[in-house]
Amino acid sequence: MSVLTNPSLLLLRNSEKLVGKSILVVNFVQDGFLAELKKRNPESKITAFSYNHANGEFAKNTPGVDVCVNHCISGNDFDLVILYYPKSKPEVLMALDNIRAVITADAELLVVGENKSGVKSIEKQLTDKANFSNKIDSAKHCVLYSFAELKQLSQFNISDYHKPFTVSVADSEFTAISIPGVFNHGNLDVGTKILLENAPLIKQGTVLDFGCGAGLIATYLGLQNPALSFVCSDVSALAIYATTQTLKLNNIKGEALLSDGLTNITGKFDLIISNPPFHTGIATDYTVAETFLANAKQHLTKAGKLNIVANSFLKYPPILEAQFDNYQTVFKNNKFAVYSS
């Protein structure tokens, strides 16, 4: 058995509940749970859904499990749904609505999560959406709930969850589209604003917006320099969807790609610009950003530049120094720093 996370261990110690003809696992984690679930349901159809491309890549070769990474769940016949509770409450509310549009009338919903994820809010969140609820078990700082007689929805339309918002940087203003689960949902964060205020001026070429979120960086630069073309990447299918909507709304030419770090990125760029992520799920995780910085140079043209913003306390300068002959700190205050190669 692969190493299992505490939420998965809690599910498996209640294995009598893990039975269904068509089982959907939402927001699964990178452990051995899907394989264990298939062992207990060898004849069942099991679908594993995630918004996260890295999780999808981890699980894609699990025998007997269909893995889907997308911005919404499709189907209509799931009689058991297992939801790993996400840290974003707007995201969980959207996911619950999506789930209620793809289940059978007699479906059961199991919700598991760590206490620190906010999972105990689930009973309140489903008060008017399920007629029956039960706290099944708790252990290892995790809780498992069961819900039945869920109120089905006839359809799910992600456009109902669009959140348009205005982005103002320097003398530029535009409208962006966000959806739940996207970084800093519905707002321009301070770090990205500082990055854009200190972005280099390039007249033409191709730009990589790494960790694109709602596509704010590419849109701002594209409005400043219409000759630029963009590749926007993110590990989140929700971010890719939001970026696509924002680019389209502002007539910016570019493509949005799912990628775990730089793994799906090809070619070289005249500018790589990013507010790189340092959270994975609930936990703080610098691995993605550090790996990105260590490998960004090979994706730059000879005269290409790297521009990033980071919290001032993060130890990125030694990594930059190891990769680039010269880099500059173009902005720094007590919270943020902008680095340029």
UniProtKB/Swiss-Prot annotation:
Domain of life: Bacteria
Location of the protein in the cell: Cytoplasm
EC numbers, comma separated: 2.1.1.172
Keywords: Cytoplasm, Methyltransferase, rRNA processing, S-adenosyl-L-methionine, Transferase
Catalytic activity: guanosine(1207) in 16S rRNA + S-adenosyl-L-methionine = N(2)-methylguanosine(1207) in 16S rRNA + S-adenosyl-L-homocysteine + H(+)
GO function terms (MF aspect): 16S rRNA (guanine(1207)-N(2))-methyltransferase activity; nucleic acid binding
Keyword field contains Coiled coil: no
InterPro entries, per the entry: DNA_methylase_N6_adenine_CS, Mtase_sm_N, rRNA_ssu_MeTfrase_C, RsmC/RlmG, SAM-dependent_MTases_sf, Small_mtfrase_dom
Pfam families associated with the record: MTS, MTS_N
Annotated GO CC locations: cytoplasm
Disulfide bonding pattern of the chain: none
Annotated TM spans: none
CDD domains, per the entry: AdoMet_MTases
Keyword Methyltransferase: yes
Family the entry assigns: Belongs to the methyltransferase superfamily. RsmC family.
Subunit structure: Monomer.
Primary role: Specifically methylates the guanine in position 1207 of 16S rRNA in the 30S particle.
Protein name: Ribosomal RNA small subunit methyltransferase C
Chain's gene name: rsmC
